[in-house]
Amino acid sequence: MAEARSKISFEDALVELEQIAEKLERQDFSLEESLKAYERGMELKKICRGILDSAEGKIEALTKDESQKTNKTGFRTESKSTSQTSSDSVLEEDLF
């Protein structure tokens, strides 16, 4: 059952979590129901956090990958002699 619950989308989990929070604030539950709702809320929070962490990791990887591509292609030089390429490297280091 927990496996099926973890397949919930971020948006659906967030909506359900907000509904639980509203009901708990209005005290629409008995104590036993409140504890079950709190437990479900914590489960939903964990699911949302996992989805957000995964998305953040993907964004960081894409950003890092794009940054590396920019660095690799941003300083390409055309065929030059070794001495000229060395002096270009020094200038690039001085600039950055």
Curated annotation (Swiss-Prot):
Its EC number is 3.1.11.6. GO terms for molecular function: exodeoxyribonuclease VII activity. The keyword 4Fe-4S does not apply. Residues 80-89 have a biased composition (Low complexity). It is found in: Cytoplasm. It holds the Pfam family Exonuc_VII_S. GO terms for biological process: DNA catabolic process. One of its GO terms (cellular component) is cytosol. InterPro entries: Exonuc_VII_S, Exonuc_VII_ssu_sf. The keyword Ribosomal protein does not apply. Residues 61-79 have a biased composition (Basic and acidic residues). It is an enzyme of class 3 (hydrolase). Bidirectionally degrades single-stranded DNA into large acid-insoluble oligonucleotides, which are then degraded further into small acid-soluble oligonucleotides. Belongs to the XseB family. This is Exodeoxyribonuclease 7 small subunit.
